[in-house]
Amino acid sequence: SVRISDTITNRGDDPQEFQILYHANYGPPLLEEGAQFVGPVKKVIPFNDHASESIDSYSIYKRPTAGFTEQVYCMTPLADYDGRTTIGLVNRSKNKGISMKFSIQQLPFITLWKNTNSEGEGYVTGLEPGTNFPNNRRIERKFGRVPKLDSGQSHHAEIDFTILKGNKAVGGLIDQIQKIQRRAQPVIETKPENKD
């Protein structure tokens, strides 16, 4: 396991908005046809109309596909009783995976970036915990997703990454996520947010 611990401090005199998104990229051999994003979600929203076309399979990955146009899904995660959530990527055979654990107080949103283009063009996915979705501040302000730091105030975030080997380890991750997911039925939106 590896922990990333990050602190952002407003060293200015005036309150300041901030946005942060931790972009963790994964590719082959973990990413493959039939690989799956796993995570307990309260809500999933397609980023745009193109992503809407595949909302029913947002968590499943295709084989490398030449000319593929990226798809992005915006999620609000569920957490355990300690306020922490766990997300991950697992391969088709469910014997390899990666998990990411973090506090939803620190990082209340997840962006899932799927870019299953040809390997030469970048067959990759991003699991991205953050304070917001990947819109500009004007749009994120509209939805109340732009936090502020007062002068001298800090925002701290930690993400624990764990590499999983074997069906038992991957099965343990899936069981943990399913336990959290039992707290609420996910809402899967078929249309993107109105950004006008």
Predicted regions and their residues:
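Hydrophobic residues positioned within well-ordered beta-strands of beta-sheet architectures
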Residues: 4, 20-22, 85-87, 125, ...
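Short beta-strand elements of extracellular/lumenal beta-sandwich folds
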Residues: 2-9, 90, 113, 119
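Acidic, contiguous internal or C-terminal segments within carbohydrate-active enzymes
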Residues: 1-24
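Solvent-exposed loop and beta-edge segments used for protein-protein assembly and interaction
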Residues: 1, 16, 79-83, 151-155
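Active-site/ligand-binding surface loops and adjacent short beta/alpha elements
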Residues: 27-28, 32-104
